[in-house]
C-alpha cells in the first residue's frame, strides 16, 4: 500500500475559533492536572512519571489555549541505577506522581512524590525557573498542599482514610507528630486530593476508582473536620468506554516483560466506564468570577487527557455542570469569560494555539519542550549537530531497556509521525528507528549485521518480526507511524525516497496499561544488541501530521443532510403528525433531510427542508420535540462535536441533549443527561450529507 507524504501542519487545540472550545484541551496525555491562578495567569502542572525533563508546567490566559513554559528539573538528581535504566533497573510508571502547584510568599511551590524517595518539593521565584529541589522525604503521595491563613502549611494525603499533616515552613519535611485522620475509611473518598479554602470553608476535591471513576467534594469549617461529602461529577465519559488493559503473565523476569513474553490485551467492555469518567483534577475561579474544573479522563492508548468543565455553586457545593444536569458537562462550551450565568455568547480568541510544537527539524541548539527522555539520559552519548539529532548506540537487549531514547506523546484522534533516519554511522549489532514506548512496545527500524542492513518491523505483543533486505546507497530512509488512537491501533510504514511509503506489518492493536502508567509515545532510538557500544544513528525532520486537527468543517453548514441515530441506525424524520421521530433505515425522502441555521458561536437551529424548524416544547419530554414555521421560535442548540461527523445537540434551556430511546419506540425528547460509553443510548447522532441530484 502506497501512502502519500504527510502535508498539514495544524495541531489540535480545544479552541474552535468561534468563541467555543471542545474537550479534551489537549488530545495527548497530561495526567493528574493541578491548576493554579496567580492574578490573571493560570498554571497547570502534571505527572511525568519516568520521563525527563520532569514536572511539566503549562501557562494560559484563558484556560483554553495553553503553552508549555517550564519543567521543574532537567533530570532526576537521584543516583540509583533505576532512574537511568542501568543494570536492568527501571522506574517505569514510577518517578514523579500527581503534583500540586501553589504560590505563596512570593514564590512558586510544586510538590510531588517519587517512588522510594518520598515527598519532594521544587521552589522558584520565577515560574520559568531556576527551580530548587527540596527532598522532604516522608510517606506522603497524591497530596494537596494548603497555605492557610494562619501561616501553617498542610498536606492532605491518603486513599480512603484521608490524613492531614503539617509541613515545616522551610520545606525540610513533615512536622513530626502532626498527622491526623480527617476523613475515615467508609465515606467513599479516594485519593488525588485538591484542597481549597473558599470563603472560610475548606473544600477537598478527591477522586475514586472503585468500582469506577468519579469525583467527590468534601467540605468542613475546620481543616481537621468533620467533613460532609458528595459526588460532584459521575458518568461523564464523553462517549468513551473502558480501555483494554495490557495483561503481563506472572513469573516474567521483568515488570515490563521481555521479547518472547506472551502479553495479552484485556477484554473491551464498551458499556463500561472504568476510569474513562472524568476524575482527578483541580478547580479554579476565572477572573470573571465563574468557576471551572480541569479533570483528567482516560482516552485509551492516548493516555489520560484533560477536560475543562464549567461549574455551578449550589447550596455551597461546587457542582460540575449546570442546573438541570448536575454532574455532567458539555464537551463543547463557551470560552471562559463569556459563559456568564447559564449560557452566553462566546468571543473568539485572537490566537488559538496548541501547547506544544510537535514537529522538529533539530536545527536549534536545544530540543523542543515537547521532547522527553525515557529515564535519565547519558548526556555524553547524544548531541545536536549539523541540523540532526545524533544518538550513540548503547548496549541493550530491546527497546524498553535502550538508554537515550527520545520520546514525545502521541496525539489523537489520528496522527501520522514521520522521521528521516541516517544510518551510515551504524556498526555491527546496531538497531535504530522509530518506536512506540508502551507495554508491549513496537518499532520499525534498521538493523546492521556485519555489513548488511535489514529493515525490520517488530511487534512485542505477538513477538512478530518482519525483515526485509534494504539498499540505502545514501544511507537515508524515512520511517512513519500511522496512528488511529481513538480506535487504539497503529501501523508502520517506510520510504526510500520520502514520497512513496509502503506499509509494513499489520495494523497493531494498542492499549493502556498500569506498568508505565502512560499512553503511547513516539520514540527515536539507537541501541546495540551485542553487549557493546556501537556506532550512531542520526535523525532529522520529525513531523507530526494531524488530519483531524482542523475541525472548521465539522458543523455541516451549507449542506443538506440526514441525521442518523447511532443507537437505532435510523434517520430522524419530520413526521407529518408533528413529532421528531425515526424512519426506516434507508429512507432518503425529503422529510429526513435537514439543514442548519447558523446562530453564531457554535449555536444552531435545525430546519427541515420542507420549511419547518425544530422546536422544543414544555419540559422536553418524549413528544415535546416538535416543529414551528416561525424561524424566530426555532430552538437554539449548542453543537457538540464528537468527530467523524458524530455530534450531539445541547439545549441552552435545560442543559440536556436531544435523543431517542432505542428500545421504547418513543419519539425524540430533550431530556438526555449525556452519552453512554458506547454512544448507543440514543443521544449521539451522525450527519450524512445528501448530495444534490444532477
Predicted regions and their residues:
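Compositionally biased, intrinsically disordered/low-complexity regions enriched for serine, proline
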Residues: 1, 21, 30, 96, ...
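Bacterial Sec-dependent N-terminal signal peptides
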Residues: 1-10
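Carbohydrate-active catalytic/glycan-binding domains of CAZyme proteins
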Residues: 9-555, 591-595, 634-638
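Lectin-like carbohydrate-binding module/patch detector with strong preference for beta-trefoil
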Residues: 552-694
